[in-house]
């Protein structure tokens, strides 16, 4: 909602036209790196997209159930890697405004690879870089197409987030195990620590 409004204010285009144009472009680009790319949208709209994101930075926060989940993963000896389709500037803003980085061993923007989590090429490049055992890896995401891509690659443990947006109702997810509150997993994680070889 913020982008069409600001695009209208800064350029004089009607807000309804801005909204319709963006909706059409989002549909074409969904799942592609451009959809997530602040540089692309800055060029396309001739707007300072990173600055506009800062205008709504009060909306950037960690879910309240996330710290306990990530702490349990840390305490259990598991390596925690965050892989996001977000542009590096979006990721930097989140790191600046939340304690997320204190819980994560490695933060990766798919922009480093030029492909998104929806694409098999990304999973191949991640495995080459990180050397993970796909069958023993847990991957958590709120996007069903991304979870399907991870499944196709052979990720052994997949978990869907049924309520990624607190302003929206909980989604019914049948294709994958789903979680509403990460804290529900803490006891099981701590009960099964990783044994170092």
Regions found by a protein language model. Give the residues of each.
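Active-site neighborhood of HAD-like aspartate-dependent phosphohydrolases
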Residues: 1-20, 152
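Short acidic alpha-helix initiation/capping motifs at coil-to-helix transition points
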Residues: 1-3, 28-35
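Short, acidic loop-to-helix structural element flanking the phosphoryl-transfer center
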Residues: 32-44, 49-82, 88-92, 120
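A general structural signal for well-ordered alpha-helical segments in protein cores
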Residues: 4, 35-38, 123, 182
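Asp-based, Mg2+/Mn2+-dependent phosphohydrolase catalytic module
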Residues: 71, 87-88, 92-197
């Amino acid at each position: 909602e913020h982008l069409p409004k600001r695009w209208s204010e800064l350029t004089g285009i009607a807000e309804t036209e801005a909204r319709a144009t963006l909706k059409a472009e989002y549909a074409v680009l969904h799942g592609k790196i451009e959809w997530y790319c602040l540089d692309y949208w800055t060029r396309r709209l001739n707007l300072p997209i990173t600055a506009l994101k800062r205008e709504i930075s009060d909306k950037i926060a960690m879910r309240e159930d996330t710290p306990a989940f990530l702490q349990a993963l840390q305490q259990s000896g598991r390596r925690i890697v965050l892989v996001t389709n977000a542009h590096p500037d979006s990721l930097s803003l989140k790191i600046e405004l939340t304690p997320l980085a204190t819980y994560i061993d490695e933060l990766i923007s798919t922009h480093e690879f030029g492909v998104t989590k929806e694409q098999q090429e990304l999973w191949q490049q991640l495995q080459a870089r990180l050397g993970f055992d796909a069958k023993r890896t847990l991957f958590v995401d709120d996007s069903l197409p991304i979870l399907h891509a991870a499944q196709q690659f052979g990720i052994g443990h997949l978990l869907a987030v049924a309520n990624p947006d607190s302003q929206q109702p909980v989604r019914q997810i049948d294709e994958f195990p789903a979680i509403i509150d990460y804290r529900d997993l803490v006891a099981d994680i701590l009960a099964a620590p990783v044994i170092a070889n």
